[in-house]
């Protein structure tokens, strides 16, 4: 049975064995972070001010590039339901493992959302489907 998050005007389903944390950061943005038992994670940052979603994705990418030495990235665009999301797919080494991450940003009702997920390649086949399902439930429920 999946767990449910329903607060701050958003809701989504996620695996019940994943840990959820919610934080307000200095900028006033809300960050909801889900972590799997194996270390993979999915998070969404919600900015209540409308900013260009492409700029938010670039800022997130730059933060990653300053944290890790070799970061390969390529732009991505996805359409999920009625939403167009843009961002980057990222690959980098961390603790001798190849990690894959995805940044997707979009705007809805004057708020800008940035979804970020990350997994090492040992878990990617399993976790990527879970990340997609969490993202889908978030977007599907924003439509209603």
Where are the predicted features?
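Residue-level marker for the onset of beta-strands and adjacent loop->beta junctions
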Residues: 1, 8, 28-31, 74, ...
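Secretory pathway targeting signatures of secreted, lumenal, and periplasmic proteins
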Residues: 2-62
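Structural motif
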Residues: 9, 111-112
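Surface-exposed amphipathic alpha-helical segments
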Residues: 18, 114-144
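Hydrophobic residues embedded in beta-strands of well-ordered beta-sheets
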Residues: 30, 112-113
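Loop/helix-junction capping segments adjacent to catalytic residues or to phosphate/diphosphate-binding pockets
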Residues: 54, 96, 124-125
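Signature of long, low-cysteine stretches enriched in small and polar/charged residues
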Residues: 60-110, 132
């Amino acid at each position: 049975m999946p767990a449910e998050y329903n607060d701050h005007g958003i809701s989504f389903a996620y695996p019940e064995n994943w840990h959820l944390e919610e934080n307000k950061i200095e900028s006033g943005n809300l960050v909801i972070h889900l972590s799997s038992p194996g270390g993979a994670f999915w998070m969404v940052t919600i900015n209540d001010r409308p900013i260009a979603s492409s700029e938010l994705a670039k800022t997130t990418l730059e933060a990653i590039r300053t944290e890790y030495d070799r970061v390969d990235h390529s732009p991505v665009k996805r359409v999920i339901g009625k939403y167009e999301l843009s961002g980057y797919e990222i690959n980098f080494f961390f603790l001798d493992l190849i990690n894959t991450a995805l940044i997707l940003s979009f705007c809805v009702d004057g708020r800008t959302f940035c979804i970020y997920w990350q997994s090492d390649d040992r878990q990617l086949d399993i976790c990527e489907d879970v990340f997609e399902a969490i993202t889908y439930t978030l977007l599907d429920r924003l439509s209603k």
